[in-house]
């Protein structure tokens, strides 16, 4: 399933666990890949900080897309994210 194809690698709790920074590895294409970030229906209170693509750090704009084999770092005030699909509304 797509949910298991994008998995959490690292989780950081900050500010008394009010903020989480979560690193995801994108092992397969999913409903968040190959779509410009501006077109994704992301939850509020969430920021895609960077995309690591083959060792190159991308500070994303709305024109960037998440691709298979990327590592994506998000920061959010939400809790309980288990996969990258959880960033969607």
Where is each model-derived feature located?
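Short, small-residue-biased leader/transition segments that mark boundaries at the very start
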Residues: 2-7
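Cytosolic Rossmann-like ligand/nucleotide-binding regulatory domains
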Residues: 23-89
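Glycine-rich, charged/polar anion/phosphate-binding loops
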Residues: 8-10, 34-35
């Amino acid at each position: 399933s797509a949910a298991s194809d994008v998995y959490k690698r690292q989780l950081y709790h900050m500010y008394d666990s009010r903020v989480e920074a979560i690193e995801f590895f994108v092992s397969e294409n999913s409903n968040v890949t190959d779509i410009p970030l501006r077109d994704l229906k992301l939850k509020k209170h969430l920021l895609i900080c960077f995309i690591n693509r083959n060792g190159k750090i991308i500070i994303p704009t709305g024109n960037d897309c998440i691709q298979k084999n990327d590592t994506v770092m998000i920061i959010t005030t939400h809790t309980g994210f288990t996969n990258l699909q959880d960033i969607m509304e």
